Amino acid sequence: MVRTPFRGALLAALLLAGCARATNLLEPSGPAFTGQYALLGRDTLAIGPIRIVTFNVKLARRIDRAIEVLRSDSLRGADILTLEEMDNRGTDRIARALHLDYAYYPGAIHPTEHKFFGPAVLSPWRIARSWKLLLPHESRTRHQRRTATAAEVVVRGLTIRVYGVHLETPAGGSDRVREDQVMTILADAERFKGPVVIAGDFNSYGIGVLLERHGYRWLTRYAGPTISYFTWDQIFVRGLKPAGPEWAGVVRRTLGASDHHPVYAVVVPEVSGAAGLVKSPGTR
């Protein structure tokens, strides 16, 4: 086959983009970005379901559109929101617009976007503490390390451990790589006795079986594709259960904000007065 100079240049550019090296940020304490934009006066004693949302906002490029999507009916009023492929500015803009507190710990500087890249946790409730969790293995293409953003969110007096995750891509690592990354998250969560949420882009559907084996509910198992034909964006919980028959779904209208579709689930605590219930020091 004869290649034109343009075609050859295009192929070379794509190859270089795929192999560009990320700058990993492996210091556990940072960089760290937090913000407090949640409205005061929320009733911490109100009884109600807990809405969880996760959305991979592709490279944090179209933040205004992402905000509009997150204001849609099934996503509006999320108690726990995880965002993937975020940078610090995009995370702050979404938090300001939706009146949320947030914790954001980038795991790398993206090799082609040249900005921070990682998952974020946001909530209208108080984030008691947060940290970066380093995940094992380096991408075989971009040599990028993955991280999870972890936070403890006090929802109506119940402390919930939340992990915003974005596992390695199929091009960057094998199923075993993603399994090892999940096991690292599970080991970190094991020390916490209250409810746990693990949500984000897992770059795999079958990985859900591993989380189920370790006692997690796979809330979005039957929600449907979240990117093209693949069902990679998922929500798993421990110590929480579906709030009703229509507890989970995928929002199809994304307004061009991303190539991913946001996913949601609605839950309640498994047991009234479950571990993790604390007296809130104030209303938020």
Predicted regions and their residues:
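Catalytic metal-binding/acid-base residues of hydrolase active sites
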Residues: K58, D87, R126, H166-E168, ...
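N-terminal, active-site-proximal structural segment of metallo-dependent hydrolase catalytic domains
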Residues: F6, L16-A97, I109-E113, E179, ...
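His/acidic metal-ligating clusters that form di-metal
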Residues: A150-Y163, S174-R213
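Surface-exposed cleft-lining segments at the edges of enzyme active sites
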Residues: K132-T141, V165-R176
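Active-site-proximal beta-strand elements of phosphoester/diester hydrolases
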Residues: I47-L59, W131, T159-T169
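Structured beta-strand-rich core segments of catalytic domains in phosphoester-bond hydrolases
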Residues: L25-L39, T82-T159, W247-T254
